[in-house]
Amino acid sequence: KRIQAEGMVLDIPTYSMYLDNIQPSINKQSILVPCYSSRAKCSMSIPVEANQQPFQYDRGGKIDSLRQYQFKIGARVEPQRPIDVSNTTLNTRAYASQEHLQEFSKALVATGLGNRSLLNHRENFVMGRSLSAMGGTEDLSEKALRVEIEYNSGHANTAKNVFTFVNHIRRLQITPSGLQIYG
């Protein structure tokens, strides 16, 4: 009788997508992610070119001359120091930014996807951040999520649309009185 009264509870991993833009020729900008989920796991932002032909649409993330980025959760910055990607954006492209690849790898693992290959990280650039450790979640219901980005001075960046995907868990409760969804 107790189970019949309480109903069935399911935790369903879902994604929400938020759109923001990067203005051209401005070095320091913020990407606002208006996600107020109570159980967020990770965030992945993909900057794509804003001016594209519909028949030649390219979904690959563009890095241009990005110098560094850092996630802000409320007043807390994650990670403590900005992630430097300038060695990836230099003309020599001598080596990849290991901090960036590590953060992106942690974001993929937090979603449950895992990573098989990060070989094309320059051609398909994604800024990722796991919001908690060990499979946990972060409560964003009272906080704002932002990505602070900074471009190299002297290099003009192009206008971009930033698609941010937030992986979070929604709770579905089915009772005799009806269905409730908690986010």
What are these regions (language model features)?
Residues K1-G183:
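Flexible assembly/topogenesis modules
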